[in-house]
Amino acid sequence: MTVSRGFAGRRRGGARDDLPPGQYDEGAGWPVLTAEVTPHLDPQHWTMSVDGLVDTPTTWSWDEMHALPQSDYDGPIHCVTTWSKFGIHWSGVSVDVLLDAVGVQDTAKFVLATSTTGYTTNLPLEHLRGGQAWVAWEADGKPLSREHGGPVRLLVPHLYFWKSAKWVTRLTLLDHDVQGFWERNGYHDLGDPWREQRYQGD
């Protein structure tokens, strides 16, 4: 596969102060972009695992995840294809809750997120801690649709949205960086929208 500048978005005037460079406000729309076939997942058969460099590798069922302390996120999301969306109310569990439950080892520095489809994306561990990331299953008070990653997706809103893996099922903590799907194909390893880190070398 080769990486192109595809999925070109449309730009609009009146940019807001909280809009990163090169982005446009999508408004009421919410584009659906994916690198794979959208799966049909039964929430009762879905599980969430956190493993790797942790003291107690743990797998939660759908019901067990919902029994954990929940929290919300209200704020923008930014897609690498140049659209941003404001005003979605997300609900789920902070990744901090999961990390506290498993016990993170001192040597853990990176995370590889894996979806039920086999899609992967890599993140520095520090970008999942401190109230920066969630495992989310609701958007605007409704179950997250499968097109947008439901029943559950990773939500890392301060990075480009390909880092918020749809249909997430596993977080593996590592002492070294392992590139995910898009990163192996030329996308940036971090993906900070305020620094326009879209592609390797940006």
Predicted segments — roles?
Residues 2-202:
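Structured, non-membrane catalytic/scaffold regions adjacent to prosthetic-group chemistry
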